[in-house]
Amino acid sequence: MKKFSLSGSRVFSSLAGTVLLAAGLSASVPARADGNAEPFTPLSEPGSAGLGAVARVGPSPYREGGSRHDVLPLYLFEGEQVFLDANRAGVKLLNGGDQRLDLFVAQRIEGFPSDRLPASLTGMAMRDSGIDLGLSWRYRQPWGNVQAEFLHDAGNTSKGNELRLGYSYDWRSGPWRLSPSLSVALRDARLNNYYYGVRGSEAAAGRPAYAPGAGINTTLGLYGSYDLSQRWRLLAGLSATVLDGKIKDSPIVQKRVLPGVYVGAAYDFGGHEPEWAKEGSPTWFKLLYGKATDDGCHLLKIVTAQCLSTASVNATSIAGVQVGKTFLENVNGWPLDFVGYVGLTHHHERGLQRNGVQLDLFMKAFYSGFPWSDRVKTRLGLGAGVSAAQRSPYVEASSQAANGKPTSRLLQYLDPTLDLSLGDLIGSRALKDTYIGFGVSHRSGIFGASRLLGNVNGGSNYLYTYIESAL
């Protein structure tokens, strides 16, 4: 897929990267126990942004854990200095063609399942996913790519360290790409003991105390993609991770070899000259205020006008600002634009819990091809991306607690809106690019199917009104 350069967008790129770094540091969600999501990060050139998802099927490493079905949302951004790759965000310290050095934070995709805890783990303290601070070096040559990464648990979850060494080879032919890879992960005792050990206080019949200590895991993978069009790409992969023998000997581990199958798709917003790099490209500023809906007033009911009322009991509210830059205009000649946004929202919890803030990064499509838009321009918008909350909003925390389900500070974000040009309404040319409207601020965990998002089945909806203007 063709990419474009963002030499004119460094300020926004840096802002986006800063937001995602903060989001990664503030998020703490359980995830699967088999390693790295990086093979499914199809963007490589500055100026690329993308959205997608990958479904994975594979066995749990834990005894009686059964098979796991997981959805990994792909939130992708490749700026000149910063990047977002699925479960990691970072800064490029060196990007010199054949060599690249990154400093990053990453969500460790490892830990006990939070939705269905197997009997073998009953009575044990939860082994949570952690946030790693890492340094990555890559060296690309025609004969292949070598990579070395050092990761340290920055959130004191396991207090462990890991060194990863890998080799991969990129084969391309027309729209096809295949990438076989081999990697080894040297894990210290703290990391392995946390995720695969049994503490003395957790020992039980058939589950003696055990500490595997340091060890080496090996992963063999084959990942591929097919370009359906300039921007749509199909993704697939196979992998097999061989756990260290001392991990396999743990009384809570059932398998030494963990296979995985992956299928997905991604959309690349590259392929055009960036609108924000053009002279006079506007910056969008949006102010919003809204209130929470009742628990049963879900997004589908709202967008179909079956539920348009806010909560009458424990009515919490939000106020926020969003800043955006246009990525694409008039896609394929249609009245369809794509705008990338960074948003900051304050939650007023009315004394029910401490107030908090929420960071959102999302791409939004605007359709304006209505028959009356030549008289009163009307935009129907739908945004999709990622949301990181300082703490789970009261609406989410209370609903999940009532159902005995976990919460997650990191969730999927959707932002459907409908607005009208204020200038067209009142006959003011100066306000032609100022819009008033209403929308829904929606956070959710993809129906409990994504362990990266904490297996949350539920979320929150806030009905809001707003004013947005291009400056």
Q: Could you describe each region identified by the protein language model?
A:
Residues 50, 72-74, 132-134, 164-166, ...:
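Membrane-embedded beta-strand positions in outer-membrane beta-barrel channels/transporters
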Residues 1-50, 64, 204, 210-215, ...:
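Cleavable N-terminal export/targeting peptides
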Residues 154-234, 240-247, 252-255, 327-329, ...:
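Outer-membrane beta-barrel transmembrane domain signature
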Residues 51-57, 88, 103-107, 148-152, ...:
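Transmembrane beta-barrel strands of outer-membrane/channel proteins
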Residues 72-76, 257-284, 459-471:
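Outer-membrane beta-barrel "beta-signal"
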Residues 68-111, 132-135, 139-151, 284-352:
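Glycine- and aromatic-enriched membrane insertion/assembly motifs of diderm outer-membrane
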Residues 34-94, 100-130, 270-272:
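Outer-membrane beta-barrel initiation region
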Residues 33-48, 81-98, 140-143, 172-178, ...:
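Short loop/turn motifs that connect adjacent beta-strands in outer-membrane beta-barrel proteins
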